[in-house]
Design a protein with these regions (language model features):
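A glycine-rich helix N-cap at a beta->alpha junction
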Residues: 78-102, 110, 119
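Alpha-solenoid helical repeat scaffolds
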Residues: 586-589, 620-624, 644, 660, ...
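Active-site cores that bind ATP or allylic diphosphates and position pyrophosphate for catalysis
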Residues: 64, 68-70, 76, 98, ...
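Alpha-helix N-cap/helix-start positions at coil->helix boundaries
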Residues: 580-584, 613-619, 655-656, 685-690
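Alpha-solenoid HEAT/Armadillo-like helical repeat scaffolds in large eukaryotic proteins
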Residues: 571-578, 606-612, 644-651, 678-686
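Substrate/cofactor-recognition hotspot
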Residues: 311-575
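N-terminal catalytic cores of NTP/NDP-binding nucleotidyl/phosphoryl-transfer enzymes
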Residues: 6-83, 199-230
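Alpha-helix capping and inter-helical loop/turn segments
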Residues: 593-603, 612-613, 627-641, 653, ...
Length: 698
């Protein structure tokens, strides 16, 4: 690998250092080792890009190894899906391997462990073993079965293999150090009994190796030079090395485990358990639901292999876990589709536009550029006629000055077509506009070169011809979770943050060029965003998934929410300046509206914490947030934080702050009890009559 082309990340630096220290480049070998118990997600895509990318950079083989050591959760369906996803991402493995390929070798090594006194059969219950193992701050104690004889251990282990015992009656543990500061080194489990059918080995085995025993040894058997995994496996490295020490042949390559940070993506979850929960509880429609963080879900939504590879490269490799905003991923797909997606016209909330001076029965086929970013994309023909569909939001009967779309007596251009002027409307019995009537400038055809065609008007609208439009189902997807880190709040179930509006389905109309569109074909619906043909499409009905908007609507929403809270904090000062209760209520109601308009839990939580300060305005605002927000409660904060808010507020110079703190405390029984002595002391010293009256009622 050329080190001059780019700065090396710390993973590449490790490899380069090993090469300098004598490791032959021909000995480099990497692997991607998924467990086939679910579908791959965006986090796996980054690990895939890392390992296969290293294989490409160093011209080294990369194995795809399935860590299939738990038949209770693993299925062939997941094996097939993983292979499909890796290939779709554009990567090719050198060898397809399975941990189950090595079951016999692992068993043989284990027999040697037992013979050397390095492993024993433990017959404790899981509860007994948990107590005996100790805690991070207290040493463990030896199992009462730790000193079984070699003969007894061999007999029991072979009988475990023969299927004589029920699950949970015995396990095999390695004999290491029950006083180790690393809990994983306190005689870790090597084998457990599982009477489950294995998707590859059938019922041949009923004892299965644990991850820590199988993983490093699989690396060793495959002669993997570098075993890269995420940071949660850092404590496992000591055990990884200990197991290798017992079997290592100095004539062979010794694998090296090193760790990198997990990429957590905002507004989603990547835990397989939580993804499975979303599927099983019908919050989504399967593993490939376009709202899921699975690769199959992202693919169905319209993400491309190039966009996911670019995302992995853009976010890079880090040593600390970090939260990547989903807008980075959305930027990557916009960048890709902007270059490759044909531009077409579709109307998703249609209202009929009738051009009254356009001849009845006439139609024109106009030239439309397929993609201005690709000079080779060419042009297509689109039909223009007297009756068109436009977006309902693109017309206002009475429009403000800065409305740059169609209205009465106002001109706009129809994309690739003519300039039209709004004249009148037809409404139904309840006042909803059903038709907009307009006239067109006959000399204003776009691209005709006439003086009229070059006139500047306030805006350009997309449209489709009513007579030629194809009806389509359009699925408008939004972020699955309202909170940026839904599973990071100990006090909350992540499902509480599921976005109830993450999917809306509309019937729209698309131009006729899309009649032959196939599954996974991608388009830019002009002015609306990027859309992908869904697998549910048929010859009778097209179905499109919204991949991503042309702009990040959530960024705008986030800024609005943040600005709303900041402006409310400024309003708080007025509360202290006005004289009457009525005026204070008016100020509080304005602040209340701003607080209740914010749905972002993390934003609310962080802003409240920041306002626990020795400042009456900040403290009053924090109490108002607790009082008026439907998103946060005292239970969403740790005990120390919430009690700090109360105690600082109750000591505030402002009686208004003290009053709001007491009102919040009245609804927070836990904190009320915890601060009982503090409140009793305040009752004796409080001088403000209103505050004292409230205190006495507590």
């Amino acid at each position: 690998m050329s080190t001059e082309e780019k700065a090396l990340n710390f993973i590449e630096q490790i490899i380069e250092e090993d090469l300098k220290n004598g490791l032959s480049a021909t000995k480099l070998r990497f692997r991607f080792p998924p467990e086939p118990n679910g579908y791959l997600h965006i986090g796996h895509a980054s690990a895939i890009a890392l390992n296969f990318g290293l294989g490409i950079d160093y011209n080294a083989p990369v194995n795809l190894r399935f860590d299939d050591t738990n038949p209770a959760k693993e299925e062939q369906e997941f094996v097939d899906a993983i292979k499909r996803d890796v290939e779709w991402l554009g990567y090719h493995w050198s060898e397809e391997r399975y941990a189950s390929d090595y079951f016999q070798q692992l068993y043989d090594w284990t027999i040697e462990f037992i013979k050397k006194g390095k492993a024993y059969v433990d017959s404790q219950s899981s509860e007994e073993m948990a107590i005996q193992k100790g805690t991070p701050s207290t040493a463990g104690t030896d199992s009462p079965f730790r000193n079984r004889s070699v003969e007894e251990n061999l007999d029991l282990f072979q009988r475990m293999k023969a299927g004589e015992f029920e699950e949970g009656t015995h396990i095999l543990r390695s004999k290491i150090d029950m006083k180790s500061t690393n809990m994983l080194m306190r005689d870790p489990i090597m084998y457990r009994i599982l009477h489950k059918h294995h998707h590859r080995t059938g019922d041949q085995w009923c004892i299965y190796p644990m991850y820590d025993w199988a993983h490093g040894e699989s690396d060793y058997l495959e002669q993997i030079s570098h075993s890269f995994c995420t940071l949660e496996f850092l404590p496992h490295r000591e055990l990884y090395d200990w197991f290798l020490d017992q079997i290592y042949d100095s004539n062979l390559v010794r694998p090296k485990q090193r760790e990198f940070a997990r990429r957590n993506l905002s507004h989603t979850v990547v835990s397989k358990r939580k993804l499975l929960q979303l599927v099983k509880e019908n919050h989504v429609k399967g593993w490939d639901d376009p709202r899921m963080s699975t690769i199959s879900g992202l693919r169905r939504r319209g993400y491309t292999p190039a966009s996911l590879r670019n995302f992995a490269n853009t976010t890079g490799i880090a040593k600390r876990d970090n939260l990547i905003d989903v807008s980075v991923l959305e930027f990557c797909i916009r960048e890709d589709l902007n270059k490759t997606a044909p531009r077409v016209m579709a109307v998703l909330d249609p209202v009929k536009l009738v051009i009254t001076n356009y001849p009845t029965g006439k139609e024109e086929w106009l030239d439309a550029e397929n993609n201005q970013e690709d000079e080779n994309a060419g042009f297509r023909k689109i039909p223009f006629s007297r009756e068109l569909y436009i977006e309902r939001e693109d017309f206002l009967e009475e429009a403000p000055a800065k409305f740059f779309r169609l209205s009465i007596d106002k001109e706009v251009r129809l994309k690739n077509g003519y300039i039209v002027k709004g004249e009148s409307v037809i409404k139904n019995s309840v006042g909803i506009i059903t038709e907009i009537h307009a006239t067109y400038d006959t000399e204003s055809l776009s691209g005709s070169g006439t003086e009229a065609s070059q006139r500047k008007v306030s805006g350009t609208l997309h449209w489709v011809s009513v007579a030629h439009a194809i009806e389509a189902e359009v699925r408008l997807y939004d972020r699955l979770f309202l909170d940026e880190a839904p599973d990071s709040h100990k006090e909350k179930d992540f499902l509480e943050f599921v976005n109830p509006d993450s999917l809306s389905v509309v019937t729209g109309f698309v131009e006729p060029s899309l009649k032959t569109a196939q599954n996974e074909d991608k388009f830019q619906f002009q002015r609306l965003g990027y859309f992908t043909v869904d697998k549910d499409s048929s010859s009778e009905r097209l179905v499109f998934n919204k991949t991503v908007g042309l702009k990040d609507a959530w960024e705008e929403k986030g800024k609005k929410e943040e600005n709303s809270l900041n402006n409310s904090l400024k309003e708080i000062n007025k509360f202290f300046k006005v004289d009457s209760d009525a005026e204070r209520n008016e100020v509080e109601n304005l602040i209340k509206e701003s607080i209740q308009a914010v749905a972002n839990f993390s934003l609310l939580q962080n802003v409240l914490k920041k306002n626990i300060a020795n400042n009456k305005s900040s403290l009053l605002f924090a109490n108002f947030m607790l009082k008026h927000s439907s998103q946060i409660t005292p239970k969403d904060f740790d005990e120390e934080t919430i009690q700090k808010l109360y105690t600082m507020s109750l000591r505030s110079e402002s009686p208004f702050v003290r009053i709001e703190a007491i009102r919040n405390l009245q609804k927070d029984v836990f904190s009320l009890n915890a601060l009982g002595t503090f409140l009793e002391n305040l009752k004796a010293t409080e001088k403000d009559e209103k505050v004292k009256e409230l205190l006495l009622s507590v």
